[in-house]
Amino acid sequence: MPRRSLHAAAVLLLVILKEQPSSPAPVNGSKWTYFGPDGENSWSKKYPSCGGLLQSPIDLHSDILQYDASLTPLEFQGYNLSANKQFLLTNNGHSVKLNLPSDMHIQGLQSRYSATQLHLHWGNPNDPHGSEHTVSGQHFAAELHIVHYNSDLYPDASTASNKSEGLAVLAVLIEMGSFNPSYDKIFSHLQHVKYKGQEAFVPGFNIEELLPERTAEYYRYRGSLTTPPCNPTVLWTVFRNPVQISQEQLLALETALYCTHMDDPSPREMINNFRQVQKFDERLVYTSFSQVQVCTAAGLSLGIILSLALAGILGICIVVVVSIWLFRRKSIKKGDNKGVIYKPATKMETEAHA
């Protein structure tokens, strides 16, 4: 083969290799789902990391929480996306994903982490408890993930996804409540991405409006992607306080999408797209807040419950003390009256009048 042809072939080979994704490719064209033969119980057969250490999501409970005063508030730079720009919304067969620009980034971590996409996890209309992370065993209605990659060390999210300290994900717990106009800027486009592979463009808006109040309060731990290949390369920030969306908005999320293509003869609804909580392997979760809030099914914190209990006990004590005081006062008064009747002087006076 002529030298020029060899050189051209070598260049072509380098170009092909450069274009290949850095993240692990499916084994033998494998696919994955949340249920069935390719469900999460089988993930580790094709994606070994899914059965390894540092897996996510986890249950956030008091036994594993430790306050860390060095956890400072994060700063969200470039989150206010211009309404004049359009951003791609995609049904990827597992969730609905919104692509984000890399100039949107987090400050406050050891490196700069630039945004790449956001997506959601949810349950189903009959069991609307589809968050991935749980708090003291309790699921929330849904969960938002905003995915960032370490742009100080790696050129893109694909390269960073299987590298140490490669990814940082912000997790927002979502509960049912009042209508949320910011989330509706995504939900209003769901009908345009109903089937797998469908895409639509969403005008830019302030992504920071998707975050909860008091973002300085959060849980922090090292974990993994919650979907295959489950790379244990994620620095998780799970915000302590949830956001609310309305029942109608949640229902739209739970019923609008399909995991299958439009022409699939056996369409499958996109529901229950959340991974079960994983073993925690004696890790610790660090908190930026000193008083741990444990959420209950009623939505009350442990502090509020204890306050109500103490108030109830105090009220009972007051009632008991007042009752004893009234009883003793009545007894003393009755004793005084008996004393007046049986005084000797009174008896003598009675006998004189007889």
Swiss-Prot record:
Residues 25-301 are extracellular. It is a single-pass type I membrane protein. Its cofactor is Zn(2+). The active site is at residue 94. Its EC number is 4.2.1.1. GO terms for biological process: chloride ion homeostasis; estrous cycle. Changing residue 121 to Q: In HYCHL; severe decrease of activity in the presence of physiological NaCl concentrations; no effect on localization to cell membrane. Residues 30-289 form the Alpha-carbonic anhydrase domain. Highly expressed in colon, kidney, prostate, intestine and activated lymphocytes. Expressed at much higher levels in the renal cell cancers than in surrounding normal kidney tissue. Moderately expressed in pancreas, ovary and testis. Expressed in sweat glands and bronchiolar epithelium. It comes from the Eukaryota. Disulfide bonds join 50-230. It is found in: Membrane; Cell membrane. Belongs to the alpha-carbonic anhydrase family. It is linked to Hyperchlorhidrosis, isolated: An autosomal recessive disorder characterized by excessive sweating and increased sweat chloride levels. Affected individuals suffer from episodes of hyponatremic dehydration and report increased amounts of visible salt precipitates in sweat. This is Carbonic anhydrase 12. It comes from Homo sapiens (Human).
